[in-house]
Amino acid sequence: MPKHDDTLISTAGVDADVGYGAVMPPIYLSSNYSFSAFGEKRAHDYCRSGNPNRDMLVEVLSQLEQGAGGVATSSGMSACDLVLNLIEPGSLVIAPHDCYGGTWRLFTARAKQKQIEIAFVDQHDRQALAAAFARKPALLWIETPSNPLMRVVDIEALVKEAKAVASKVVVDNTFLSPALQKPLSLNADFVVHSTTKYLNGHSDVVGGAVIAANPADAEQLKWWANCTGVTGAPFDAWLTLRGLRTLNLRIERQQASAGVIAERLAQHEAVSVVHYPGLKSHPSHAIAAKQQLGFGAMLSFEIAAAPEHVRDFIAALDVFTLAESLGGTESLIAHPATMTHASMAPEARACAGIDDRLLRVSVGLEHVDDLWAALSRALAVLPAPKQRAARRLEAAK
């Protein structure tokens, strides 16, 4: 087997077509497959249960994540929900208090249905974590870097604590992908992805994946995926595998640009704070440098102006597209409070530190100079520092 990820993803599915010798894998759209004889099932019988395109995608993702197998699902959220089937009803799940809004919504909804018990915990708060682990959780959910505040936790250290109370560990690796982080090598039990993001990388697929560290868990995932019908479509799997082939090349460029933009934003007078693990000022920079292979292409920042000026900034911004999602070739900007995290209760957003002035950036493949020029022009429309100071004084009276 190839030793390098670049070779793995470039050769995945190549020469798989033994019938016609197609170099690139065909799209297998058939909903069902014939039996070779009575009682003799082939490798596939029904598309919900198995499909060659999904198999190829899961195989290469398992290799990249150093796992034992898993499932390609219809979305990132269905991947998250699939994992919950592997724990007993009513079991406790510990999740980060600053997780993606869709994850927060899912766990909150499942808790209301009494399917799970949920504890949203600041995973940097040692006392809060110790109290949560004392309750013997069945599952520890990690999102690192977190969405949208780019907080980083020590996966290996948290896994050790979780294993001490017999808890399984899931890591959402969407923000970095296996190109930059391999949680299973740090002893996590599961990795989840929204394959919509960096893995596909072209903003034309919605999908998800769960990869397990051990074969028994992988088989359980497959059984539940077939049972609940959350498996992804063949064409989506084919598109994702096609996009995956350029993953390392894309991330290398995107990450380089993100680092430049983060440094410049951090020095700009119209920006109050920048969240990017690659900055030496980031509180978890050392942890990120230890467990990641790079700092990624996602960042967020707060404007140094009142929340109502976010609208002015967005109106003046070009090159970037105002949209949810991330990880595509195009640069995106989002306002978490009204977009990606709008489903979170306002008090939950406040607890997580998601301010109304916060903007999240997914850096694409455009030239970094064009991206910075666009940001600079938009930042220039914000009130000047003296005006901001005067308004703060006026507000304090």
Show the residue positions of the predicted features.
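Short conserved active-site loop signatures built around small residues
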Residues: 1-27, 210
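Conserved PLP-enzyme active-site core in the AAT-like
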Residues: 70-268
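PLP-dependent enzyme catalytic core of the Aspartate aminotransferase-like
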Residues: 117-119, 135, 315, 331-397
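Short, well-ordered beta-strand elements within core beta-sheets of diverse protein domains
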Residues: 240-249, 296-304, 360-364
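Positively charged, small/polar-rich N-terminal and surface patches that mediate targeting and assembly
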Residues: 1-6, 14, 52, 273, ...
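Conserved small-domain helix->loop->beta segment predominantly found in fold-type I
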Residues: 259-327, 331, 344-350, 389
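Glycine-rich phosphate/pyrophosphate-binding loop
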Residues: 27-28, 36-56, 60-63, 332-357
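Conserved N-terminal alpha-helix of the aminotransferase class I/II PLP-enzyme fold
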Residues: 32-86, 102-109
